Amino acid sequence: INKNFFDDKLSLNATVGASINDIQEDAMYLKGGLEQIPNFFHYGNINVNTSKRNESKWHDQVQSVFASAELGWNHQLYLTVTGRNDWASQLAFTSKGSYFYPSVGLSWLVSESVKLPKAISYLKVRGSWAEVASSPNRYLTQMQYTYNEQTNTYEYPASHYNTNLKPENTKSWELGVNAKFLGNRINLDMTFYRS
């Protein structure tokens, strides 16, 4: 959405979307000494008496919906708000199967609002707050059997799974100034942030 209101004094830019990130692996690994032909690295040339097999099979999926909106006033003041919700397979079998993380930012183009000295071509101040979340590694919330190469069997896991696991959250904020001087010949970009 890209709309202007009140004789172009108020602007609205908005986006809504969804995504699926789906990653899978289904692999078998075979290692061992070579049988007859030197430097011929092929599974048919591996000595069956020394060979060891390992299998890996996993499937991760994150389903997401997201939205962002920017409200502008008189080409001077801008408010930006975003939000995203993820459903991650790594958090299956937990009470916290999905997680939401928002952000909000405010910027002011001072050079469009106030008469500044000629030496200052452009001046903008900005501030924002954001929260970011990420899911844990796979198999921490459900039982995983491990493959034993010596016995060629799957074994009961030594560690227990955690159904109370939650996503990792990071909150941060930042303040900044962008300035240009002497007809845009000198640029200054300063940011102070904390995470």
Where are these regions (language model features)?
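Extracellular/periplasmic, surface-exposed regions of secreted and cell-surface proteins
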Residues: I1-S195
